[in-house]
Regions:
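Short, small-residue-biased leader/transition segments that mark boundaries at the very start
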Residues: 1-4
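Conserved C-terminal "lid"/linker of ANL adenylate-forming enzymes
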Residues: 13-20, 24-29, 44, 48-120
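Short beta-strand-to-loop capping motifs
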Residues: 30-34
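Short, conserved charged micro-motifs
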Residues: 36-46
Length: 120
């Protein structure tokens, strides 16, 4: 919840993604408030620094990506499992209850921009 303290971030989710060295590392997905015109890279760097300052470097939190919106079910539950599978490059069952299927493509593209899925 600490990520929320940044005034530019409207919503966020953190999922554990596969990592060759550590087994799993946290990856943040940030949805910015509308009208934020600061550079995404700057905001990501601030959020990562803020989390590391709060939780400590043991959190291994180094990466976050900005997305338009979080994938949710129609009842509002964040589809973290699906986000993890996209980041890990795994096949995933299409979530029948997803609110807007187009968002999964947006997430795939956003993840590609920071090098996910990692190729073996």
């Amino acid at each position: 919840g600490d990520v929320y303290k940044r005034q530019d971030v409207a919503e966020c989710a953190v999922v554990g993604v596969a990592d060759a060295l550590k087994g799993q590392v946290p990856l943040g997905f940030l949805v910015l408030k509308s009208g934020v015109d600061r550079a995404g890279d700057t905001i990501v760097a601030e959020v990562v620094q803020s989390v590391r300052n709060t939780i400590g470097p043991v959190a291994a939190f180094r990466q976050a990506v900005i997305i338009q919106r979080l994938p949710k079910t129609r009842s509002g539950k964040i589809l973290r499992g699906t986000m993890k599978k996209i980041a890990d490059g795994e096949e995933y069952p299409f979530p029948a209850t997803i609110d807007d299927p187009a968002i999964l493509d947006e997430i795939t593209i956003a993840l590609q921009s920071i090098g996910y899925p990692k190729s073996e």
